């Protein structure tokens, strides 16, 4: 793979079987794979630029070809895995004492999980719709922690959330109520949220023709209102915001490659033409040849890069990298930080100025973190993978969020708000108010869009790379695996830009591909339903309906599917999703319905048509044979 005339990495394949033998990076480093006689990955080695070889991990497999034991030689932790009869992972035991167990329901959804370390653990249960209670069986209705329900959902006839009840304790509950934007025609509606109300506090939203957030009005408990208006260019890049909340107007200028070249801050105004000089300006200067998306100077501060496009000198800090894209060591400005990653590239440890924090993961979700200073924090997630609560020093705390997923506050079990956060549109922390007695505001790591914030570094860790809210860009380029997977969609992309310069209505929790904060979760749920039972045409109808809702925010099913490929939430749904993407009927249906804005009467018939086309293919037949063998049921045609 080459960018700007420079080859970033080269993969050498083994003869006969085509397995990846070695990946060599532009820095001279390489990763070498070792396979067992069954052609399963048995070990991996890191080869440094000077030729030294370090073994990273070892795998052993069970008789079904599943990894039974994984030994991480960097962290010294060995994990053993247990599976059920159809190959789903149901248990993990780690040599450091961490144990995880999972339970699935008849639709292949995670029904709940328990984990424990040092004899302290928690049980989380997801509540799905019960037909006998006149609930929709495909939707989540709540979450329990240690047997106590903490979240409950109510839906309208279209399956949209209209109320979320947060149970802080038996005696303290708050309720969020949602309304939705009407469609262009009578009787048509959308999945775009028009308002969110919680007690005497509310937010309302309007959108432009492309589905971008145009205005947000925040109504406080005292009845006062503060408005933010957003402006976008033809590429949906944020070019201006009139921010009454921050009492300023900000204008953004980009070059043709999607690089921000100037950011100007003015006194708050709603005038279309600004004649006064900016109160503050930030300037960005880029590489003039080769890889032109590389930021070389920010407000005069220099940035230098290695051959992979990773910064070596970054705004007063020195950075060291390994395995192509992994940030290993950062020094400067009183900071000395080391990071360690697992075989999937997820961070499992950081050591900052002598204090080590270990992360205990389920996929990319941090179930718990412990630090060498003796602290432990447990985190809890909803059925869509969004963090909603934490436990610290034996006390439960709950996050208050806005529609964008920004964590605005932390509440205790009495519903009292102890911490308040305020960010700019790009996630830079502007204000932190902490009324707690234990420094909760700084201790809590989840902030803007629900991302993990490294307080010491001033950046967000997005599961594969770091995002700097000061510059509004990723620190290093995206992994070129993204280009290999979706070359037609991403080869023209700026691999350093954050959410293609639309930070308001988009998020990128993986550091790979952005998604909209409003509707892609809904589409993802529908795809998961198809994966759980690909023989139910109503599940396919849901995919089509959600895809229609995304137009023109996301063009067709395929683009949304590409976004979901890089998340850990969808499990093994890639094959199903690709069937949607490449089914001719699906493309034709989506194209014919692009003029709509919301649900239509033809949605269900469209879903049935896609289902009919899919079930005639070889993928369906093979899958159904296995499904019938395991489940012993007939498909619903």
Task: List the predicted regions and their residue ranges.
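Intrinsically disordered, low-complexity Ser/Thr- and acidic-rich flexible linkers and loops
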Residues: 49-52, 125, 131-136, 183-189, ...
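A motif-centric feature for acidic-aromatic and gly/ser/thr-rich catalytic loops and repeats
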Residues: 130, 178-184, 284-288, 391-463, ...
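Short, low-complexity export/processing leader segments characterized by acidic and small residues
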Residues: 347, 409-410, 428-432, 468-475, ...
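Compositionally biased, low-complexity segments of secreted and virulence-associated proteins
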Residues: 511-535, 540-636
């Amino acid at each position: 793979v080459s960018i700007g005339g420079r080859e970033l990495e080269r993969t050498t394949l083994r003869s006969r079987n085509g397995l990846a033998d070695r990946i060599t990076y532009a820095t001279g480093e390489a990763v070498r794979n070792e396979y067992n006689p069954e052609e399963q990955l048995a070990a991996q080695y890191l080869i440094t630029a000077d030729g030294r070889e370090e073994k990273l991990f070892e795998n052993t497999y069970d008789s079904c070809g599943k990894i039974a034991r994984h030994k991480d030689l960097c962290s010294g932790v060995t994990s053993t895995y247990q599976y059920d009869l159809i190959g789903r992972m149901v248990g993990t035991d780690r040599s450091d004492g961490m144990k995880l167990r999972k339970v699935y329901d008849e639709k292949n959804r995670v029904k709940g999980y328990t984990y424990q370390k040092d004899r302290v653990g928690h049980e989380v249960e997801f509540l799905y719709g019960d037909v006998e209670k006149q609930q929709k069986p495909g939707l989540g209705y709540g979450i329990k922690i240690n047997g106590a329900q903490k979240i409950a959902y109510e839906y309208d006839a279209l399956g949209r959330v209209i109320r979320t009840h947060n149970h802080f304790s038996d005696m303290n509950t708050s309720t969020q109520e949602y309304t939705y934007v009407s469609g262009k025609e009578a009787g048509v509606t959308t999945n775009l949220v028009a308002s969110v109300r919680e007690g005497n506090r509310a937010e309302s939203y309007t959108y432009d023709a492309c589905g971008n957030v145009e205005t947000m009005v925040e109504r406080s408990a005292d009845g006062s209102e503060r408005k933010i208006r957003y402006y976008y260019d033809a590429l949906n890049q944020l070019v201006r915001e009139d921010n009454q909340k921050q009492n300023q107007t900000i204008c953004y200028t980009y070059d043709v490659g999607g690089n921000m070249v100037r950011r100007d801050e003015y006194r708050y105004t709603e005038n279309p033409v600004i004649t006064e000089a900016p109160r503050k300006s930030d300037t960005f200067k880029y590489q003039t040849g080769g890889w032109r998306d590389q930021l070389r100077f920010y407000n005069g501060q220099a940035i230098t890069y290695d051959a992979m496009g990773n910064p070596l000198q970054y705004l007063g800090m020195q950075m060291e990298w390994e395995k192509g894209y992994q940030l290993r060591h950062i020094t400067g400005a009183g900071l000395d930080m080391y990071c360690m990653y697992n075989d999937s590239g997820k961070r499992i440890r950081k050591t900052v100025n002598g204090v080590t924090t270990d992360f205990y993961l389920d996929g990319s979700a941090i179930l718990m973190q412990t630090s060498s200073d003796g602290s432990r924090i447990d985190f809890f997630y909803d059925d869509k993978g969004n963090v909603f609560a934490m436990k610290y020093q034996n006390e439960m705390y709950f996050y208050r969020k806005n529609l964008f997923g920004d964590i605005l506050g932390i509440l205790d079990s009495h519903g009292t708000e102890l911490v308040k956060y305020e960010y700019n549109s790009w996630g830079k922390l502007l204000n932190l108010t902490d009324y707690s007695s234990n420094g909760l505001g700084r201790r809590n790591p989840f902030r803007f869009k629900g991302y993990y914030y490294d307080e010491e570094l001033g950046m967000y860790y997005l599961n594969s790379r770091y995002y700097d809210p000061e510059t509004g860009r990723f620190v290093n380029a995206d992994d070129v695996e993204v280009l290999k997977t979706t070359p037609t969609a991403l080869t023209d992309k700026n691999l350093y830009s954050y959410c293609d310069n639309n930070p308001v209505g988009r998020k990128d929790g993986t550091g790979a591909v952005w998604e909209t904060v409003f509707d892609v979760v809904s589409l993802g749920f529908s795809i998961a339903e198809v994966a759980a039972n690909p023989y139910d045409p109503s599940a396919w109808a849901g995919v089509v309906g959600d895809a229609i809702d995304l137009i023109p925010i996301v063009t067709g099913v395929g683009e949304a599917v590409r976004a979901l490929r890089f998340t850990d939430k969808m499990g093994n749904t890639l094959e199903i999703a690709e069937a949607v993407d490449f089914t001719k009927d699906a493309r034709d249906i989506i194209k014919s319905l692009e003029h709509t804005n919301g649900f239509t009467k033809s949605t269900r018939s469209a879903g049935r048509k896609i289902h009919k086309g899919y079930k005639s293919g070889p993928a369906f037949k093979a899958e159904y044979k296995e499904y019938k063998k395991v489940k012993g049921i007939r498909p619903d045609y």
